[in-house]
């Protein structure tokens, strides 16, 4: 675990298929909880054989670009899209560590569901070698929630858990549970409603809905 000497870099990865208000509430709440300047969105590459309904990466990126234009606390990193292939999170973080140096505080933002399934991630125990993790948590989470985690993840969390403030002061090695609003919304919810020709108002930013309608996305 190293002490940080640079502006913390808060990274939020996902397919963003499409980006929705749940993503944005989580990103902004995490930014405030950690006291950082901005959140970098990292859209991931989606293989063409993936069974879930997907759209071209250019559309997913375009929707993010529209969102970023309306929020100066958000920016986009296309490193995974540019690679043109699936990249494990641990490899992305290793590359960022090499790029930014040993003293940069790198924070990868995940949801509670991702924490619960973390032991299924490729080389999950190596994630903290390169970065910190911030977990978007329910605002009134109880100790029972932590006890419900798989034993390996729960023990790992107990060993590495720090406060939000500590997280931004160290380069890597910590995990913070953030008390942030929780919105029960997913990209699949949005896609299903679009496929059923139902309204998605208030589920996505207006600029995203306009783009989806203009390009007739997720209609099948």
From Swiss-Prot:
Highest taxon of source: Bacteria
Listed name of the protein: Probable nicotinate-nucleotide adenylyltransferase
Lineage: Bacteria, Pseudomonadati, Pseudomonadota, Gammaproteobacteria, Cellvibrionales
SUPFAM superfamilies, alphabetized: Nucleotidylyl transferase
A molecular function GO annotation: ATP binding
EC numbers for this chain: 2.7.7.18
Gene: nadD
Role this protein plays: Catalyzes the reversible adenylation of nicotinate mononucleotide (NaMN) to nicotinic acid adenine dinucleotide (NaAD).
Range of residues in the leader sequence: none
Protein family: Belongs to the NadD family.
Pathway: Cofactor biosynthesis; NAD(+) biosynthesis; deamido-NAD(+) from nicotinate D-ribonucleotide: step 1/1
Annotated catalysed reactions: nicotinate beta-D-ribonucleotide + ATP + H(+) = deamido-NAD(+) + diphosphate
